[in-house]
Curated annotation (Swiss-Prot):
Organism annotation: Xenopus laevis
Domain G-patch residues, every copy: 154-200
Molecular function via GO: RNA binding
Name this protein carries in UniProt: G-patch domain and KOW motifs-containing protein
GO (cellular component) term, any one: spliceosomal complex
PROSITE patterns in the cross-refs: G_PATCH
Keyword Lipoprotein: no
Family affiliation: Belongs to the MOS2 family.
Swiss-Prot/TrEMBL keywords: Coiled coil, mRNA processing, mRNA splicing, Nucleus, Repeat, RNA-binding
Lineage per the UniProt record: Eukaryota, Metazoa, Chordata, Craniata, Vertebrata
GO biological process: mRNA splicing, via spliceosome
């Protein structure tokens, strides 16, 4: 029985598990966050502590000159039985020989640079691990943990690697000609600005006005900077003429800007070419002055000659009275001289009267405007923007006044404050196209072209609406219409 019991002894299996040490934030660091800190004083916006924090040194990641491959049998060697005295002496001798040969190789590599092995070849994987069909990654280092990334911030990683390679801030790199070269920063060029062009160079070409000496208590005028977000401007044309505002945004592709008006706070979109930069003093003084926008102020500003005409007439009348009194005192002179004076007086009077009539007729009524929305016109002004839009077709988007409008080109560009004399009407080439009557009795009516007479520059138009009749109209009285039609 005893023999049978001994043969049935229990069998047990054991496994050894090696765990990697993880980088964790110690409890001491967490406790330091909650420690009390005593303040000594305050300088500006900075608080002075009784225990100032040590200055942070620049982070350095040392360069790996030679890879230290992990040994896969490291755990087995540790668990192996201790070596005898003879084996320990033998292993120590082998290590010393290997170290001595390594130093000799390093000395030879320093003396003879032609025999140096490239760094990538020195640090390559040993043979038999990753050069077969089955890749053995046992020599590879362990993957990084989250705590490893906390030690090195992402923003300082690149600079830390450069410092480990020997780079120092402010010192140039290179072997013979060391020079600190600043990195080239690319700047976005505005649309239409040619290569090599610089907008700042225009300021040096402009004639500079001589500066007057400042009076006691007078402040120097503030020089207006370039047009940008927050700049104070004045609108010189369009529906918001003579109003002040500040730039909220700029669209360089369409040459337009978003302006917040000083009066009312409304955000409007205007052309960049209708803006004038102003300084802060002018903006503060006139931005919210409503008296500038009154009709009385505008009339006195546009027509100042009206105030001076009565004075001129009084001066002329006074001169005539003085000449008459002097002539009465010299009645005793010869009749021939008296007759000559009277004739000269009548001639001078005849010469003055047409001038006075011209001054009275200076204010002429504006010509009849033929501008309408949704009509196609042709641009005929060669001087506008250097003739960029000359002889191009465009569409009238909006009519600001009887003789001014806003146009949109075929490319989608918006042109503001375009005068009527810069445009001409367009007649469709094909019959059956819609036109609008812009002048004459049927002004504003839409119709279809039935027949065109090129020799006499007129067309037979079938009008729509109440008349519904065919009329012969001149080319100057009709224009191509692209808006909605009543079928």
């Amino acid at each position: 029985m005893a023999a049978a019991g001994s043969s049935q002894a229990p069998i047990s299996f054991g496994f050894n598990r090696s765990s990697k040490k993880k980088l964790l934030v110690s409890d001491g660091e967490k406790e330091e966050e909650h420690e009390k800190e005593y303040l000594v004083g305050a300088e500006g916006k900075e608080l002075l502590s009784a225990n100032p924090a040590p200055e942070s040194k620049p982070l350095v990641i040392p360069l790996i000159h030679k890879n230290r491959w992990a040994k896969p049998n490291k755990d087995k060697e540790e668990d192996a039985a201790p070596q005898t005295e003879d084996e320990a002496v033998l292993s120590q001798a082998v290590k010393e020989l290997i170290e001595e040969s390594r130093r000799a190789q390093e000395d030879n590599s320093e003396t003879n640079q032609t025999l140096s092995i490239p760094l990538l070849m020195q640090n390559r994987m040993p043979d038999g691990y990753e050069d077969r069909e089955k890749v053995d990654v046992s020599l590879r280092p362990d993957s990084a943990e989250a705590a490893d990334y906390d030690v090195v911030p992402v923003q300082q990683y690149g600079m830390a690697m450069l410092r480990g390679m020997g780079w120092k801030e402010g010192e140039g790199i290179g072997r013979t000609f060391k020079q600190d070269v600043k990195p080239l920063e690319q700047k976005l060029r505005p649309k239409g600005l040619g290569l090599g062009a610089d907008r700042s160079a225009l300021k040096h070409l402009e004639p500079q006005k001589p500066r007057k000496p400042l009076k006691p208590g007078e402040e120097p005028e503030e020089e207006s900077k370039g047009l940008g977000t927050g700049s104070a401007v004045q609108i010189q044309s369009g529906a918001y003429k003579d109003m002040y505002g500040k730039v909220e945004g700029i669209d360089p592709d369409n040459s337009r800007a978003m302006i917040t008006l000083a009066i009312g706070g409304k955000v409007v979109t205007v052309s960049l070419f209708s803006l004038r930069l102003v300084n802060s003093a002018e903006y503060t003084k006139y931005a919210k002055d409503l008296s500038r926008l009154s009709k009385v102020h505008q009339e006195s500003k546009v027509e100042p000659h009206r105030d001076r005409t009565p004075e001129k007439e009084q001066g002329r009348k006074g001169g005539e009275k003085r000449s008459e009194s002097s002539r009465n005192a010299d009645v005793k002179l010869s009749k021939s001289s008296g007759n000559g004076d009277s004739n000269n007086r009548e001639k001078r009077h005849r010469q003055r009267s047409p001038e006075q009539e011209k001054e009275k007729k200076k204010i002429r009524p504006e010509p009849h405007g033929w501008l309408r929305r949704d009509i196609r016109v042709r641009f005929i002004d060669k001087n506008y923007k250097g003739g960029k839009y000359y002889n191009s077709k465009m569409l009238v988007e909006d009519v600001l006044s009887p003789t001014r409008c806003v146009c949109r080109t075929e490319n989608g560009c918006i042109l503001e404050d375009i005068r009527q004399d810069m445009l001409e009407t367009i007649i469709p080439k094909e019959e059956g196209e819609h036109v609008m009557v812009v002048l004459g009795k049927y002004r504003g009516m839409v119709g279809k072209i039935l027949h065109r007479d090129k020799q006499k520059s007129r067309a037979l138009v079938q009008l729509q609406g109440e008349h519904d009749s065919a009329e012969t109209l001149s080319y100057d009285a009709i224009c191509h219409y692209t808006g909605a039609q009543d079928d």
